[in-house]
Amino acid sequence: MKKTVIASSLAVALGVTGYALTTDNSAHASESTTNYAQLANLAQNNPSELNAHPVQAGAYNITFVKDGFKYNFTSDGQSWSWNYTYVGGADTVATTQAAPAAQSTDYSASYSNEASTQSVSSNQQSSNTNVEAVSAPKTTSYSASTSSSSSASTGGSVKEQFLANGGTEAAWNAIVMPESGGNPNAVNPAGYRGLGQTKESWGTGSVASQTKGMINYANSRYGSLDAAIAFRDNHGWW
């Protein structure tokens, strides 16, 4: 579906003084909840903002859990990276050291603004050993990858389930990743939801039902999945 995105800088969205962090990287308790919610919202719904700018000046290491997702934002003062992984835990107060990621991970998203290699440095991913991240170049584009770990309860990673239910590699890369980052539970402020970020009822279903819904949607609206991919590439929405 067509979506209108109103862009804003990190300074406007999150305050010109950064994220209410002191010089020792500890969070002000009275301000952390709001800032964590804003950071989480950017990671889920507007990752290009995080790709374009560090969240604050200087080196930092910000980690917290929000709505079941564990978020980590790091910088050495020159380059920066961020990622989030679903762990299913309760919201926690941020710490300056990243905690080990849960082994039941089904999907994650991450970004690094360093050179375009096939993996980020080990110190940036030490808490997410099950995540296969793809680094992105220094542009406002967003790059993410689903976890390669499998889960008996879900039948494999999100990408594996998508491909097993009729989805294609091309559709995953051209539609799913730009729209939702591979997160089947993604919901943006305008109400678009799921892997394909539509307002269709199947957008809140299982990965299998979302995959089949996306294929039917592409066939009925564009004539074929390939035609839908071409439209998404040309227009930036579908």
From Swiss-Prot:
Residues passing through the membrane, by range: none
Superkingdom of origin organism: Bacteria
Region described as Disordered: spans on this chain: 115-157
Enzyme Commission no: 3.2.-.-
Signal peptide residues on this chain, from the entry's feature table: 1-29
Family matches, as InterPro entries: Lysozyme-like_dom_sf
Bias-annotated ranges (Low complexity): 116-131, 139-157
One term under GO cellular component: extracellular region
Keywords linked to the UniProt accession: Glycosidase, Hydrolase, Secreted, Signal
Any one Gene Ontology molecular-function term assigned to this protein's record: hydrolase activity, acting on glycosyl bonds
Keyword Secreted: yes
Subcellular location: Secreted
Keyword Signal: yes
Functional note: Is able to cleave peptidoglycan.
Assigned protein family: Belongs to the transglycosylase family. IsaA subfamily.
UniProt protein name: Probable transglycosylase IsaA
